[in-house]
């Protein structure tokens, strides 16, 4: 039998002790685990060491640059990039092992299933949330985006069976606080890139998003959690464009 490609799992962390252990337990099949930490003050580092991870300290660079830095710390060319609140299912683990036996391409994506209000969403924006996370670092890399980062692959991308579970286990207040930070970063990045918002985008973007994810992708089948998840996503669109308009007005006044 052909020996499979060696695999490094890489994570970025900051005070992730509450979620980290299930993640590390799910990737015990990897040849190496690398945790790049940006200054945790909780038990994150102790948990990582307990599971045999190699810990690297790096001040925060932004989501894309931080994840690419983590990829660069891996000992192996094939990397699986995860967040601390994610878990690899047995089905996905088997699919990854099979793919690495004889890789057909340099990058693989798979579905992520998001848990919201204690329920794994099966429709709408919550599933399938396609993520490209397994790749040969010579054939793909993380974008330089400070937020909404994504992997840029040079060639074909294949799809694996099995789900990645996203267990954020947050309160609504914490979730909204995170979304507020993300929309601020997204607005600043779009503005810096020369993009401009308008009243039409401010009004239409949330409506289009609601129709797409709640109606067309049947988010309504996820009950009240699906409705709340969709509405918050729509408000994120509204918030991003509102913040861009604020930046535009500041530019005009200056």
Predicted regions and their residues:
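N-proximal low-complexity "stem/linker" segments adjacent to membrane-targeting elements
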Residues: 1-26
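Short beta-strand/loop segment that forms part of the nucleotide-sugar
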Residues: 11, 30-39, 56, 84
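Acidic helix N-cap motif at the loop->helix transition within catalytic regions
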Residues: 18-21, 42-51, 91-92
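A conserved acidic beta->alpha catalytic loop
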Residues: 26, 37-47, 83
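Short, well-ordered alpha-helix to beta-strand connector turns
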Residues: 30-31, 52, 74-76, 154
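Short acidic donor-binding/metal-coordinating loop in glycosyltransferase active sites
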Residues: 38, 58, 76, 83-86, ...
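Conserved donor nucleotide-binding strand/loop of the catalytic core
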Residues: 45-73
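Catalytic-site signature of metal-activated, phosphate-bearing donor transferases
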Residues: 65-71, 77-78, 89-254
